[in-house]
């Protein structure tokens, strides 16, 4: 947690990383967000930056049970409101952080007043779909199947990948790059 300068209106901002990232990807932007005047920015808004590790990732411990983005959003909302005392905040997320940020905005809109995501989740609001939406779904599924081998292997055979990734930094790089 890094608090903003007292000179400006402070806005709490939770930055949520993805995979294979960690909070390290935010290190270069935290200071400019907290102290914009040091970087020539004269805006009246700056941020209190909170950059937690997703449970089970990087610098965080392993959860007792498997949890998904919606549960993590609940945990992060409690972090922001109950633990840190913010009534309102905004969220930014990429990759898995996008999914978590989306749930923050959806389930916790009383507190999470805005989200910025850089990976758009494909969701449909409940209710009947138009013909255009049905056609989009059909094309999306075709594209998804042909372009998502990465996701399919990670979600169905992660143990297979783990052998290469644990054995060699080159194995990790080959998969990620």
Question: What residues fall within each predicted segment?
Answer:
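A contiguous catalytic/ligand-binding core that recognizes phosphate-bearing ligands
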Residues: 7, 20, 43
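Flexible "cap/lid" subdomain of the alpha/beta-hydrolase fold that forms the substrate-access gate
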Residues: 57, 63-92, 98-99, 103-177
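The serine-hydrolase catalytic nucleophile loop
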Residues: 19-31
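Short beta-strand element of the alpha/beta-hydrolase
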Residues: 10-18
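A short, charged/proline- and glycine-enriched loop
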Residues: 9-11, 45-46
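Short, small-residue-biased leader/transition segments that mark boundaries at the very start
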Residues: 2-8
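Glycine-rich, phosphate-binding/catalytic loops in enzymes
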Residues: 29-33, 67-68
């Amino acid at each position: 947690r890094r608090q903003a300068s007292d000179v400006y209106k402070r806005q709490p901002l939770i930055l949520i990383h993805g995979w294979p990232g960690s909070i390290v990807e935010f290190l270069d932007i935290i200071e400019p967000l907290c102290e914009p005047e040091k970087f020539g920015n004269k805006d009246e808004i700056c941020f209190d930056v909170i950059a937690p590790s997703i449970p089970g990732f990087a610098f965080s411990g392993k959860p007792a049970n498997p949890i998904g983005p919606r549960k993590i959003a609940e945990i992060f909302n409690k972090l922001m409101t109950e633990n840190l005392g913010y009534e309102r905040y905004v969220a930014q997320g990429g990759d898995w952080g996008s999914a978590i940020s989306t749930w923050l905005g959806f389930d916790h809109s009383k507190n999470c007043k805005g989200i910025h995501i850089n990976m758009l989740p494909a969701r449909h609001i409940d209710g009947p779909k138009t013909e255009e939406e049905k056609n989009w779904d059909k094309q999306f599924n075709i594209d998804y199947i042909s372009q998502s081998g990465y996701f399919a292997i990670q979600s169905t055979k992660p143990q297979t990948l783990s052998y290469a990734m644990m054995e060699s930094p080159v194995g990790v790089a080959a998969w990620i790059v």
